[in-house]
Every structure is written in C-alpha cells, then in structure tokens.
Amino acid sequence: CSKLHYNLFFIIFPDYNRTPFPDTSCFFPNATSEMMRDYYRVIYPEFDSGRFDELLEQFGLDPRRKIQTFSKGMKKQVSVLLGICTNTEYLLCDETFDGLDPVMRQAVKSLFASEILNRKFTPVIASHSLREIEDICDHVGLLHRGGILGVPDLLIGREEGSRLVAEGD
C-alpha cells in the first residue's frame, strides 16, 4: 500500500516495511522512552520491546527519564533505537549522526551493521557529511534540486557548469 497516513509525530507506512525518522526527533510532550516504546508497539506489529529495553541499557539511556531533558545526541539515539526495533525492512534516516559524539556514532554504525548482517534491513541515510557515511554505505548518490546529481566518484573535480569532453585520434 503506498498511501501514507500522517499523525502528529510520524508518518506511518501501512505496509510496515519502512520506518522514517527525521532530522528533528518527534516525541510526545513529557514522554519517556518507555512511553514511546509502548506507542511504537501499537503502531508497528513487529516492534521488539525486549530488544528496545536491552538497547536502551546498552546505550546508557534511562527509560523513565523524560526525553525532553535529553541532549540532542541522546534524543537521536532514542530515535535510532525505536526505528531499529520496529523490525521494518527499511529505515529512512535524516542526518543520523548529527549530534552524536564519536563513540555514539561508532555505536550506531555498529548497530546498523549488525542489523544488516542479521536480517533483511536497509537504512537509507540522508546526510550532508559524506565522510560520515562513506565507510558504512554500499551506494552513495548526491541529490541536488530534487534529482540525483550523480555518485561522488564521478563528480570529484567537476565544477558546476563544466563539461566532460572526450577526444580521440
């Protein structure tokens, strides 16, 4: 089903194969991670509450603390963990690593790698930092003005307005 349903906090895809998480985290006012877990469990039939609780502990996040008191990086971590635990095939991410310290960036990258190895999972990551994603992505494309500009290897050294000319004997 390609029809989208919109609620106040997330776009929900009825086919349950995709989970979006935007650049800015969207949580209920005064929500805790536990409350968001319970909400996601209702929306996503395959949501793994036990795994979410384990990951919260692994990432050192207090499940009963109000998310609004978290730092930007901690909010991003909760968003990633919620997305992972939906067990959807695709996780649509916007600026996934923005706000994360280097240790947490590596932890999230490792979590993505583990998910990719253990189940059918594809994170689709939008980022302004190629360096941040080049070590974990199989394919990278550059978007510009609503279209695909190309892949980084083909665009290196190319300036806007320049042409590639091939001449031969």
Indicate where each model-derived feature is located.
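Hydrophobic anchor residue at the start of the ABC signature
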Residues: 80
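Helix N-cap at the start of a conserved alpha-helix in ABC-type nucleotide-binding domains
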Residues: 102-104
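ABC-family P-loop ATPase nucleotide-binding domains
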Residues: 22-75
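Catalytic Walker B motif of ABC-type/P-loop ATPase nucleotide-binding domains
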Residues: 91-95
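A short, surface-exposed alpha-helical micro-motif characterized by mixed small hydrophobic
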Residues: 133-135
